Amino acid sequence: MFNNNNNDKINNTMMSNNPSGQIINLESIDCNSNLSNTTSIKDSNNNNNNNNNNNNNINNNINKINPNIDRKVLDDFNSKSIKIIDNKLNKKNSKKNLYSKEVDDDINKINLNKKIIPNETNSNNSNNNNNNSNNNNNNNNNNNNFNYNNNINSNNNIINNNNNINNNSNNNNNNNNNNSISLYVDTQEKSKKKVNAESLRGPIIFQNFILYTFFLIVIGTAEGTSWAPEIRVANFVPYCVMCVVLLEFNRLHKKPLLRIIFPLYTSNIPFAYMCIFSREARKYVLISLLFFASCLCIFLQSGIPDLRKHIVIFCIIFMINYGCCILFMDWFYIDTTGTKPYRGRILATKIHWGEEATILVSMALLGCIFIVLEKFIKSYARCVAEQHYQIQCLQKEKEKLQTEINISLKKLDLDTPIEKIMDILRSMINTSESENDKKQLIKVIAVLGSNKLYDPDFKFETCTDDAEVYSWLQSMLNREVGYSNVNNNNNMMMIENNNNNTIINNNLIEPTSPNFSKKLTSSDLIPRIRSMPEITDQGIQELIINNFLEWDFPVFQLSEITDGNPLFYMSYFLFSRHKFFEKFKIGIDCFKNFMRKIESGYDSTNPYHNSIHATDVLHNLNYFIEKSFGKFLTDIELFSMILAAIIHDFKHPGVNNHFQINSKSRLALKYNDKSILENYHLHQAFIIMNEPESGILLKLSDSVRKEIRETIIALVLSTDMAKHFNLVGRFKSMANSFPTTTNTQQPSSSSSSSSSTTIPTSTITPTPNSTTSTTTTTTTTTTTTNNNNNNNSNNNSLNNIINNCSSSNGSMGASGADNSNSNNTNNSNSNNQNQCGSSIFLNSNKKDRLLLMKISIKCADISNPSKPWNLYTNWSNRVTSEFYKQGDKEKESNMDVSAFMDRNKPATTKCQINFINIFVAPIYEIWSHHFPQFKLCYQNILSNLSRLEIEQQQQLQLQQQQQQQLQQQQQQQQQIHQQQQQQLHHHQQQQQFQHQQHQQQLQHQHQQQLNNQNQNQNQSNSNNSNSFGLTQSNYLIVV
């Protein structure tokens, strides 16, 4: 039994030692080295008992592969090869006993039912069955024999995949034990594409049919054409029946070899018949030689084994058949009178045996010629096959080299840029001689090896931020941010609290608004539809048209005059302005249904995340598009950005993702704590988009709808604050790879005077007094814009407003904003400013443009600090109010209150300052650097930040004063307390002195009493002694 590695070694050895197609000498194979992994067989005698079986099976399969191999040579080769293999195996079996049950199971699983073509040597197959039934151990050896034979049968495939097997055998050496060995016994077996017997075989049956038909035509035309009138047409029927019977009888044979040999040998029967009846016409010699040559030509195409032997046999049979026909004719044609019923009329010319002998010798010579021709054809075919094989080898080698060249030229580069950087740094370390440089490079590799390349390294232990800021930042990012000063005891307390509060209020899991608890129906929309003002309201017209290109768009005023529906009107305006209704086949009714459902899904009870915030984000995003990069976007990208802004906070429950995770809500479980609310917004919005009455994407093709959906998903998911730093880091890397074209050209006075978006630099001064100037300038520019636009807006319908806006400010072109009208007040500025960030878009691909779109919607979403102070304070108050509502819910659920969300510990200014410094200012700094037309936004941030810092300083001063006052009060109280303590101490001392005096008096009195008692006792004792003495004297006197 051998594994794959051993088979490959034996195959390679045989191929290398057999370049000329000679029989391989197996004694040259070193089984000690090539069969080192063989396992021992349980009973070595079984191998000796099955040598005959091996010989028979090998012979059968070799005959199948190359039927023209000499039988004697094969028998000698088989006997020698089996003996050598058995001897080698016996030596190995005596040294090793590694045959296990696993190997037995694997061997028993080998398929023993593969078909083998039988031939002359199959008579010994019954011996194999007898040996298998006598001893169960022989099953393993028989399995080996069959595998041995099957490998010989499939040696063509093994040769074709020789290189692959050699490469894969080392990998599979430890996994598979294949009990087989492959032998290569001839040059044709050595070739990778061997031409087998089937491909060398001609259409034998068809050629026999042609042969019979030809002589049939000869019979049918001999008498009619008078070239042989003695051949009667009456012979046509018996000859035809004879040929048909032979051809049909040949179809009954199931064995392919018999179906080839049978028609060749049975062709002697029609020949005998034709030879006999063509004797009278003296054409039998021509017919015999023609028939004989035709049969030999067919024989050469038969491809049967031992072709020469069959040619000799056929020649002998044919000559005997011809001689018998001559003898039969000499016996049969003897009737001279025509009266004998069973004899033929005597021949016109008698048979001359010398002439017949000459014909037989000619047939023998013709047979020898065909034998030599067969040998030559075979040698020539072998030579052609070898040349063809060599050509194929060269062709495959050429293709292999060409493939390697193509791979080297067009190799798929699977190395990431960071891997290439690491390789470059490692090579620099290896070539560097300075130890200091090596240490620095190693440090760089360690930094690059981090899995958070685009996230800042928060180290609160090295900065002045407190634990409250850390907790707030952690809740914003939904992950640990590196704060190391958190007490572990607090974490343990949180775990205990979570274990005690396992039941969470269902109100925290399900949305609290009625709009979230059930699906919107038409009846739910009726109150909103009735409460919406008329679309012909002049105030709505003027407000949108005059301010949609202003950064300080009065979104709260729009909400008031639209009765809480600002998103509907702003979306309607932008859809008409960008011609989305025509480009994306959106019906007006479908759009209205869609927008009413979307705006109804924004909970008006949320102080911040409501339709006003969605309108503000939509306006901000459109402002970025029209002021800068709109012309670089495709229609699909522009449409996707507008839709993403509309639905980005759809059905927001008023709490953040951190709350969802801590409360173990249904949404957190559904979305696996990853971008929970963002996924929820998308899911609910796409449900509405798929409804028939509100499906604004249903009329688009599948490919366009798929692209819009993918873009919307990417944009809405990018609004997750947990992805903020990664997104900013990627934008930095991408933007730094493009040259930044900063426009320093100032607009002319005429253009600046007519521009409604030009903001004087005085409005950016970060002082509290700058608000007045900002308001004044904004009012002036707004008034100018109103005057320009009111001259062109005369209709009272929203469609006329849209058309009027398109004519006055320009409509978006096929690729974005294209302000083409000469009355547009922003042309002179926007044309110059659009060049600033154009290099990024001009040199970017679709992936980079998607990153830019993500940054733009991110900036639009957190743009509150970039607004003027009056708008910013309104937004910050709303955010704080929503934070406090979340804190109240956390208290109701016995959860830890998040940072800056406890209304009992207000810290709005501190929260806003940290939000600006950590999130808003860095991204707007990069945004305005690459798009200078947005520097107003960044400088508003700096202005608001300075005011917040002033407020914080004032608050700190107030706190310090209060602390000082409190300290003074505490000091006064401490002094009074000290005085009181001193007085109390003095009083206590007096009391102690008086008490001591009193104790001394008591002790003195007590001592006097003791003395008096002692005196009295002494007196009493003396009196008693005197009385006793008198008593004794009296007694003595009596006595």
Swiss-Prot record:
Catalytic activity: 3',5'-cyclic AMP + H2O = AMP + H(+)
Deleted gene: phenotype: Null cells show a reduction of phosphodiesterase activity on the cell surface. Aggregation speed is similar, but from the mound stage until fruiting body formation it is slower. Aggregates largely remain as mounds; after 15 hours (compared to slugs in wild type cells), after 20 hours (compared to culmination state in wild type cells) and after 27 hours (compared to completion of fruiting body formation in wild type cells). Thus, slug formation and culmination appear to be affected. These processes were not only slower but also less slugs and fruiting bodies are formed.
Extracellular side: 30-201, 248-256, 305-310, 378-1039
Coiled coil start-end: 384-414
Annotated transmembrane regions: 202-222, 227-247, 257-277, 284-304, 311-331, 357-377
Regulation: Inhibited by 3-isobutyl-1-methylxanthine (IBMX).
Biological process annotations from GO: cAMP-mediated signaling; response to caffeine; sorocarp development
Region annotation (Disordered) ranges: 40-63, 116-181, 738-835, 978-1033
Localization: Cell membrane
InterPro entries referenced in this protein's UniProt entry, alphabetically: HD/PDEase_dom, PDEase, PDEase_catalytic_dom, PDEase_catalytic_dom_sf, PDEase_CS
Function summary: Phosphodiesterase specific for extracellular cAMP. Involved in the degradation of extracellular cAMP specifically during multicellular development.
Protein name per the record: 3',5'-cyclic-AMP phosphodiesterase 4
Organism, as annotated: Dictyostelium discoideum
